[in-house]
A protein has these predicted regions:
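Soluble catalytic domains of enzymes that build or remodel membrane lipids, polysaccharides, and related
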Residues: 94-108, 119-288
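N-terminal, active-site-proximal structural segment of metallo-dependent hydrolase catalytic domains
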Residues: 2-129
């Protein structure tokens, strides 16, 4: 039985290693990129293979397990929440959320200064208490997963919905000149949607790069282990505010909701799961 398990763990570890390598070619072939998102599971397989090894393979699987854990633990240093900072909640609320009133109450209890909301059904009266508490801002009304809103308690200097093809993003600007972005590219579930997501991320990265001080939040439909996400960070000159292993989306518990900062002191943490398949992110920031 022990030899039986070792052999199958070894085969699983070889397949996991192949998946890690394949995922890094996702910029060239969209199905390959899908493999990149499951690094937490590959790490677990490498650990099991290292501690229940076939002869002569322990060192190899220990190396890959350690490398995977180091990747998952990035960024290694995260700042504490800045004192007196602005509070923003990003939340993909799910288009068909069955408990909008309860969700609204939970969001109001966070006492954030701003809300950025994805997949919000603006025709659902359960969200009206939020709109009353956050009367400023703008939204893209659409009965689809690409409805988007950026709401604020205080007036914003700018708030506009911009389109990249069929897909919106929001750029707002506070009175102190900080740019705020709410992003939600399409999921890469077909070649057409994968190409649209790649174009969306490339365009918003270029726009973000031109900002001296900015915060981008959203459901990127991309994990930190994707080469497209790495390219976005590089081209936008932004940095992530949550650790890569942080799960934000069910059912696979992957990290696809992000808060990315540029020229700001930022701290972010997940809030408890509610009635959506995503977790909210609470972000606090100040200028550097």
């Amino acid at each position: 039985m022990s030899a039986f398990i070792r052999l199958r763990l070894h085969i699983l570890a070889l397949l996991a290693l192949a998946a890690v390598i394949a995922g890094q070619f996702g910029s060239f072939f969209w199905p390959a990129e899908l493999f990149s998102h499951f690094l937490p599971y590959y790490a677990a397989i490498f650990i099991l293979a290292a501690f229940w090894p076939r002869p002569k393979w322990r060192t190899l699987w220990l190396v890959y397990a350690a490398a995977s854990l180091l990747w998952l633990a990035q960024p290694f240093i995260l700042p504490d929440a800045p004192s007196g900072g602005t509070r923003l909640v990003w939340y993909n609320v799910h288009l068909d959320n069955p408990a909008a009133e309860a969700e609204s109450a939970a969001l109001l209890a966070e006492q954030a200064d701003l809300l950025a909301l994805g997949e919000i059904n603006l025709d659902n009266p359960g969200w009206q208490s939020l709109r009353q508490a956050y009367p400023h801002g703008c939204q893209h009304r659409e009965h689809s997963p690409f409805a988007l809103a950026m709401w604020s308690k205080q007036p914003l200097a700018v708030c506009e919905v911009r389109m990249i093809g069929d897909y919106p993003y929001i750029r707002a600007q506070t009175a102190d000149g900080t740019a705020l972005y709410a992003l939600h590219p399409p999921p890469p579930i077909s070649s057409e949607l994968a190409e649209a997501r790649q174009h969306y991320l490339a365009e918003t990265a270029r726009t973000l790069a031109a900002e001296p001080r900015a915060l981008a939040v959203g459901d990127f439909n991309s994990s930190p282990f994707s080469p497209l996400f790495a390219r976005f960070l590089q081209e936008s000159s932004s940095r992530p505010a949550t650790r890569y292993f942080t799960p934000t989306w069910k059912p696979f518990f992957l990290n696809i909701d992000h808060a990315l900062a540029k020229g700001l002191n930022v701290s972010a943490r997940t809030l408890p799961w509610q009635h959506s398949d995503h977790r909210p992110l609470l972000v606090e920031y100040t200028g550097q």
